[in-house]
């Protein structure tokens, strides 16, 4: 018997060709999920499924409940109407077969933790197992306990660099070592060479993946468990959906059928108003409107807690954009200004009437381009500013002088 009794499948489960007959006993989905699948290979697999796919529409009350909850978590802009219906169907099946007493009505508060690594630093390299090494007692003593911040809420801004360790303990060790007998140079070289060979042998075998530890490594990297006593689950690969499901207390299943304990991904956090968004395509903050969004790694645990991992690397919050002054805003029909706000209005930059007649084949005075009597617009204002057709893109716009540019590129 399959470990999960009722499984709700998202489009990602069909696109990844998940063996849903091995994951669950009863497979549910909605018709919109099947409709949005366009590739031929997946549609061919849907035509000959080895299990019965049940279509069920969620009730409006559960759709409304999931919509309100996703707005509180901040994932509502990243969810489509199909995603919300899949979440509502999972909530409805959980209410029918298990109950809603253990589900959460409000998302938990965000817990903040700091990290020395850059947020885009790869934590796990494919093909290698890098276990975390515990700190030795000497390294723990070197830390400065008085300089540790009590409240880590603003540690990414106030404490970019770790405090310098105390050197009193090291000076005492040096004085003690000088009083002892100093060994000869030959003995030191022999001992150092033996230790180097020993360290090399330890390093060679420390990070390899072997048949003995591959299952343990897969569980550590994927943060998954074998589902036990799980009656209702949802198979999805979308982070926004996983975030909502975990924070509500519902079960999330991976494509291989494992139960996901944590969902790890990235969000954008405004360092001006401290609001977050999971829409990674945004450039300006939706709350304050400034261009102050920074990428932050987050981890959603199985209890629904959202942990944000800030970086103490000073390169994350660099002072780029404060060196050169912006150009004076220009007005008029053909003004070109840098894009500074999301709701900034720009002129339409239309072509002249003579230039539009070249592309309008239904115009009474249309002349083919191969004719020797064709006229080219070279004297109008739009022609001198190199304004092109709106279908091909607007005219050339002045860039922000503080923006980064590619190096070693020849200028025209």
From Swiss-Prot:
Phosphoserine carried by residues? 184, 201, 325, 352
| Top-level lineage group | Eukaryota
EC number in record: 3.1.-.-
- Function (record text): May play a role in mRNA degradation. Endonuclease required for processing of 20S pre-rRNA precursor and biogenesis of 40S ribosomal subunits.
Disordered: annotated segments: 121-147, 178-210
Q: Which InterPro entries match?
A: NOB1 (IPR039907), Nob1_euk (IPR017117), NOB1_Zf-like_sf (IPR036283), NOB1_Zn-bd (IPR014881), PIN_dom (IPR002716), Ribonuclease_PIN (IPR033411), WRNPLPNID (IPR033461)
Gene3D superfamilies the record matches: 5'-nuclease, Nin one binding (NOB1), Zn-ribbon-like
Coarse class of the primary localization is nucleus
Q: Does the keyword Transmembrane helix apply?
A: no
Q: Which UniProt keywords apply?
A: Endonuclease, Hydrolase, Metal-binding, Nuclease, Nucleus, Phosphoprotein, Zinc, Zinc-finger
Q: Zn finger regions (NOB1) covering which residues? A: 260-332
Q: Do you know which CDD domains this protein is assigned to?
A: PIN_Nob1-like
From start to end residue, where is composition biased (Basic and acidic residues)?
Answer: 136-147
Residues in domain PINc?
A: 5-108
User: What is a single cellular component term in the Gene Ontology annotation?
Assistant: preribosome, small subunit precursor
What is the annotated quaternary arrangement, including any partners? May interact with UPF2. Component of the small ribosomal subunit, ribosomal RNA processing complex (SSU RRP complex).
Q: What is this protein called?
A: RNA-binding protein NOB1
What GO biological process term is on the record, naming one? Answer: maturation of SSU-rRNA
Q: Which family does it belong to?
A: Belongs to the NOB1 family.
């Amino acid at each position: 018997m399959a470990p999960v009794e009722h499984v709700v499948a998202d489009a990602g489960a069909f696109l990844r060709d998940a063996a849903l007959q091995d994951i669950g006993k009863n497979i549910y989905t909605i018709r919109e999920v099947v409709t949005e699948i366009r590739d031929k290979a997946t549609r061919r697999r849907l035509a000959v499924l080895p299990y019965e796919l049940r279509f069920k529409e969620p009730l409006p009350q559960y759709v409304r409940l999931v919509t309100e909850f996703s707005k509180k978590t901040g994932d509502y802009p990243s969810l489509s109407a199909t995603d919300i219906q899949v979440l509502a169907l999972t909530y409805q099946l959980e209410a029918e077969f298990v109950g809603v007493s253990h589900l959460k009505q409000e998302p938990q508060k965000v817990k903040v933790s700091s990290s020395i690594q850059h947020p885009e630093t790869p934590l796990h390299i494919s093909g290698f197992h890098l276990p975390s090494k515990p700190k030795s007692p000497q390294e723990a003593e070197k830390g400065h306990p008085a300089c540790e911040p009590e409240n880590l809420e603003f540690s990414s801004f106030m404490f970019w660099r770790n405090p310098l360790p105390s050197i009193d303990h090291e000076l005492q060790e040096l004085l003690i070592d000088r009083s002892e007998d100093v060994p000869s140079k030959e003995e030191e070289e022999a001992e150092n060479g033996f230790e180097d060979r020993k360290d090399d042998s330890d390093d060679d075998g420390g990070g390899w993946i072997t048949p003995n530890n591959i299952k343990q490594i897969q569980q550590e990297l994927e943060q998954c468990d074998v589902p036990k006593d799980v009656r209702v689950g949802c198979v999805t690969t979308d982070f926004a959906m996983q975030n909502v499901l975990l924070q509500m207390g519902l079960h999330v299943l991976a494509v291989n059928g494992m139960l996901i304990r944590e969902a790890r991904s990235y969000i954008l956090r405004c360092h001006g108003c401290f609001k977050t968004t999971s829409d990674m395509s945004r450039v300006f903050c939706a709350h304050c409107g400034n261009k102050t969004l920074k990428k932050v790694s987050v981890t959603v645990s199985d209890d629904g807690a959202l942990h944000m991992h800030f970086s103490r690397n000073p390169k994350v919050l660099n002072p780029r954009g404060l060196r050169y002054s912006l150009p004076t805003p220009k007005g008029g029909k053909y003004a070109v200004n840098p894009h500074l706000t999301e709701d900034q209005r720009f002129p339409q930059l239309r072509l002249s009437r003579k230039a539009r007649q070249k592309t309008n084949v239904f115009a009474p005075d249309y002349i083919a381009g191969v004719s020797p009597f064709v006229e080219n617009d070279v004297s109008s204002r739009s022609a001198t500013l190199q304004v092109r057709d709106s279908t091909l893109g607007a005219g050339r716009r002045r860039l922000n002088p503080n923006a980064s540019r590619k190096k070693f590129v020849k200028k025209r």
